[in-house]
Amino acid sequence: MTNRLVLSGTVCRTPLRKVSPSGIPHCQFVLEHRSVQEEAGFHRQAWCQMPVIISGHENQAITHSITVGSAVTVQGFISCHKAKNGLSKMVLHAEQIDLIDSGD
């Protein structure tokens, strides 16, 4: 089964960095996406806020470059996590994050 998602947007919440009891670093943030997409010949506004998590020592360098307002493209897979309130939420598990150059 295929499970791939590529989403570009802006980091809209301060990244939360933690280390698991087994020593694996994790970085969580929320990505806000806004765009215009074409559907059935019509333009429509597309908008979402997607929780993102990236894990592992090999990703530490990029996670320390991410701040609120950073424009990024995230590639990975989606999975459901159960929130503290008992509700399920979809989360993008990042395998690659690229900073988007603002052109400044």
From Swiss-Prot:
GO biological process terms, semicolon-separated: DNA replication, synthesis of primer
UniProt keyword Nucleotide-binding, yes or no: no
Record InterPro entries: NA-bd_OB-fold, Primosome_PriB/ssb, Prisomal_replication_PriB
Keyword DNA-binding: yes
Pfam family, one: SSB_1
Annotated SSB domain residues: 1-101
Annotated keywords: DNA replication, DNA-binding, Primosome
A GO molecular-function descriptor: single-stranded DNA binding
GO cellular component terms, A-Z: primosome complex
Gene3D superfamilies in the record: Nucleic acid-binding proteins
Quaternary data: Homodimer. Interacts with PriA and DnaT. Component of the replication restart primosome. Primosome assembly occurs via a 'hand-off' mechanism. PriA binds to replication forks, subsequently PriB then DnaT bind; DnaT then displaces ssDNA to generate the helicase loading substrate.
NCBIfam families assigned to the protein according to its UniProt record, in alphabetical order: PriB_gamma (TIGR04418)
Function: Involved in the restart of stalled replication forks, which reloads the replicative helicase on sites other than the origin of replication; the PriA-PriB pathway is the major replication restart pathway. During primosome assembly it facilitates complex formation between PriA and DnaT on DNA; stabilizes PriA on DNA. Stimulates the DNA unwinding activity of PriA helicase.
Entry similarity comment: Belongs to the PriB family.
Name of the protein described by the UniProt record: Replication restart protein PriB
Organism in which the protein naturally occurs: Enterobacter sp. (strain 638)
